């Protein structure tokens, strides 16, 4: 059993339907499988919805290894647009991560990369979400 490292992952998000809306999702967790967690986030579509004043972050990923309650300690938005009755679907613009075995995080150890969702991935996700919510989100 490996010793877990403290990891911080920052995901810069852009609203698919409003390019002016940008948010930064910060996830702090203890895991010795940072590369798996990073890969999972890189393949993820992130949906946010606000219910009763609480912002829920829903991560859907095609990876076999997903962030789960066992390793995610804290997940919060440092900037978050006001959500009304619905939610927002985000694409990941940039992801940075940092991991230290001694528990101290240093911005100098960040690794950055960017991605863009394909149209087919987005359509598939919208169909899943439409089914989940009970109404059609596709334009």
UniProtKB/Swiss-Prot annotation:
Function: Plays a major role in antagonizing the type I IFN-mediated antiviral response by degrading or inhibiting multiple cellular factors required for either IFN induction or response pathways. Acts cooperatively with NS2 to repress activation and nuclear translocation of host IFN-regulatory factor IRF3. Also disrupts the association of IRF3 with CREBBP. Interacts with host mitochondrial-associated membrane (MAM) MAVS and prevents the interaction with RIGI. Interacts with TRIM25 to suppress TRIM25-mediated RIGI ubiquitination and thereby RIGI-MAVS interaction.
GO biological process: symbiont-mediated perturbation of host apoptosis; symbiont-mediated suppression of host adaptive immune response; symbiont-mediated suppression of host cytoplasmic pattern recognition receptor signaling pathway via inhibition of IRF3 activity; symbiont-mediated suppression of host cytoplasmic pattern recognition receptor signaling pathway via inhibition of IRF7 activity; symbiont-mediated suppression of host cytoplasmic pattern recognition receptor signaling pathway via inhibition of MAVS activity; symbiont-mediated suppression of host cytoplasmic pattern recognition receptor signaling pathway via inhibition of RIG-I activity; symbiont-mediated suppression of host cytoplasmic pattern recognition receptor signaling pathway via inhibition of TBK1 activity; symbiont-mediated suppression of host JAK-STAT cascade via inhibition of STAT2 activity
Record carries keyword Ligase: no
Keywords: Host cytoplasm, Host mitochondrion, Host nucleus, Host-virus interaction, Inhibition of host adaptive immune response by virus, Inhibition of host innate immune response by virus, Inhibition of host interferon signaling pathway by virus, Inhibition of host IRF3 by virus, Inhibition of host IRF7 by virus, Inhibition of host MAVS by virus, Inhibition of host RIG-I by virus, Inhibition of host RLR pathway by virus, Inhibition of host STAT2 by virus, Inhibition of host TBK1 by virus, Inhibition of host TLR pathway by virus, Interferon antiviral system evasion, Modulation of host cell apoptosis by virus, Viral immunoevasion
Keyword Methyltransferase: no
Family designation: Belongs to the pneumovirus non-structural protein 1 family.
InterPro entries, per database record: Pneumo_NS1
Subunit-structure text: Monomer. Homomultimer. Heteromultimer with NS2. Interacts with the matrix protein M. Interacts with host ELOC and CUL2; this interaction allows NS1 to form an active E3 ligase with ELOC and CUL2. Interacts with host IRF3; this interaction leads to the disrupted association of IRF3 with CREBBP and thus reduced binding of IRF3 to the IFN-beta promoter. Interacts with host MAVS; this interaction prevents MAVS binding to RIGI and inhibits signaling pathway leading to interferon production. Interacts with host MAP1B/microtubule-associated protein 1B.
GO cellular component: host cell mitochondrion; host cell nucleus
Sequence motif DLNP, location on chain: 136-139
Transmembrane segments: none
Protein name, UniProt field: Non-structural protein 1
Description of its domains: N-terminus is important for IKBKE/IKK-epsilon reduction. The DNLP motif has IFN suppressive functions like binding to host MAP1B.
Subcellular location, record wording: Host cytoplasm; Host mitochondrion; Host nucleus
């Amino acid at each position: 059993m490996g010793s877990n490292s403290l990891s911080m992952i920052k995901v810069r998000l852009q609203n698919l339907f409003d390019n002016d809306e940008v948010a930064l999702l910060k996830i702090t967790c203890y895991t010795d499988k940072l590369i798996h967690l990073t890969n999972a986030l890189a393949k993820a579509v992130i949906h946010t919805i606000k219910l009763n004043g609480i912002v829920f972050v829903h991560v859907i990923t095609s990876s076999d290894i997903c962030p789960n309650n066992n390793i995610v300690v804290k997940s919060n938005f440092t900037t978050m647009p006001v959500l009304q009755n619905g939610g927002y679907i985000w694409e990941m613009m940039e992801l940075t991560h940092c991991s230290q075995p001694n528990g101290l995080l240093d911005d100098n150890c960040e690794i950055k990369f960017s991605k863009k969702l394909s149209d087919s991935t987005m359509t598939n996700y919208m169909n899943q979400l439409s089914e989940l919510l009970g109404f059609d989100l596709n334009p």
